[in-house]
């Protein structure tokens, strides 16, 4: 099988040296992602496209899906590459390929040509289109808004029969821009803002301020791992977790109620800036949107920015909540966000929308900054690829099994789409479907006299969810890894 990768248009207008660098980086990113599916595949870069050739036909759908999620790719063409002799040969091959698709449809033919030939692209379009129209009686030519467009590419003595076109996410290849540190809470905003910076070519590391215990951190780890695995797995990134409960406790005890929200955000920026400096990261990323909550007025945002020299990027600053939720739905983080607890909004009963710098600084004089230094020093830094291994260490009390007993039920916790694409069937045991994002609210409705064996393809989500359910008091869960 063969795929032709078309570059994001902004890449093609760069200078020659920059364009070549971007293409080289994108080629490396594609190799890094696809090697998990087929180690023998070939990735070949050209001036205006990248070719991917693979031998394992069983991985065709997985490879195609992975390509649509790599930043820097505008669209993917799945093609059949065959030799041809003349225009009539092109027509005959197109007839075999497209006859079934064109039955009873309106169609047009579009051709791109490279190389030296005694015919033009329009000549091929007319010849092939006329031939298809004659040989498929129920088909009809329609040059504007046809039901089917027959795409052909001619390159020297090769004909590319385009079997399908699939849109990519666009943007710049990860690694073409500098690293950033995303302040991730697991909600709608931070997930979308992280994705937007990945799509713009940044390697996104994650910094999480834990305000709600182990269960909260597990949920945010899931979001970060999902974003990385889906859009940024070509690069290694860090997940830094900071236990911010001591800082919140100090704020609740010593800071005036109205100033708590702004001061909490200032403390987070201070801590994140220290982490960014430690790892040589150039900017912080937040999901703040203008006027969304009390701390996100222009006055308050300016005061928050003032505590650090580190650049703070806010890609969602002009977005409304509906737009953000729609983006979260598109990238797949909506269900995570809906079940994620929100802690920041509850610590202040009457927050100020226009904080005064003098008052904020006066309140912060009451704060013991050694507490902030201590939590940053004790921050837990993990390679995001090791989340599964770390979870295995943390859930030693959760048994992993490769078999089952008479009272066991396998619980498939993959997303609905994954379950529909690849249903799980295991002989001799019942399999129940319950997506991971519904476990927190629906697991208690299941028969608690049964033992539930949580399963997902890679075992990451099942381990994270097993730990979460254990913390909620459910002792009838195990991890199933056949």
Swiss-Prot record:
Cellular compartments annotated: Cytoplasm
One of the protein's GO biological processes: thiazole biosynthetic process
InterPro entries in the cross-refs: Rhodanese-like_dom, Rhodanese-like_dom_sf, Rossmann-like_a/b/a_fold, ThiI_AANH, ThiI_fer, ThiI_N, THII_Thiazole_biosynth_dom, THUMP_dom
Which Gene3D superfamilies does the record cross-reference, listed alphabetically?
Answer: 3.30.2130.30, HUPs, Rhodanese-like domain
UniProt binding sites for ATP: 183-184, 265, 287, 296
Q: Which PANTHER family match?
A: TRNA SULFURTRANSFERASE
Q: Which HAMAP family match?
A: ThiI
Q: Name one GO molecular function term.
A: tRNA binding
Pfam families attached to this UniProt entry: ThiI, ThiI_fer, THUMP
| Catalytic activity line of the entry | [ThiI sulfur-carrier protein]-S-sulfanyl-L-cysteine + a uridine in tRNA + 2 reduced [2Fe-2S]-[ferredoxin] + ATP + H(+) = [ThiI sulfur-carrier protein]-L-cysteine + a 4-thiouridine in tRNA + 2 oxidized [2Fe-2S]-[ferredoxin] + AMP + diphosphate; [ThiS sulfur-carrier protein]-C-terminal Gly-Gly-AMP + S-sulfanyl-L-cysteinyl-[cysteine desulfurase] + AH2 = [ThiS sulfur-carrier protein]-C-terminal-Gly-aminoethanethioate + L-cysteinyl-[cysteine desulfurase] + A + AMP + 2 H(+)
Family per similarity comment: Belongs to the ThiI family.
Q: Which residues form the THUMP domain?
A: 61-165
One GO cellular component from the entry? cytosol
The job of this chain, per UniProt, is described as: Catalyzes the ATP-dependent transfer of a sulfur to tRNA to produce 4-thiouridine in position 8 of tRNAs, which functions as a near-UV photosensor. Also catalyzes the transfer of sulfur to the sulfur carrier protein ThiS, forming ThiS-thiocarboxylate. This is a step in the synthesis of thiazole, in the thiamine biosynthesis pathway. The sulfur is donated as persulfide by IscS.
Q: Hey, which pathway is this one from? A: Cofactor biosynthesis; thiamine diphosphate biosynthesis
Which major enzyme category is it? transferase
Query: Which ranges carry the Rhodanese domain?
Result: 404-482
The encoding gene is: thiI
Q: Which SUPFAM superfamilies does this UniProt record tie to the protein?
A: Adenine nucleotide alpha hydrolases-like, Rhodanese/Cell cycle control phosphatase, THUMP domain-like
- Give the main localization category: cytoplasm
Paired cysteines (S-S): 344-456
Keywords on this record?
ATP-binding, Cytoplasm, Disulfide bond, Nucleotide-binding, Redox-active center, RNA-binding, Thiamine biosynthesis, Transferase, tRNA-binding
Protein name (record): tRNA sulfurtransferase
Active-site residues per Swiss-Prot or TrEMBL entry: 456
Enzyme Commission code(s) on record: 2.8.1.4
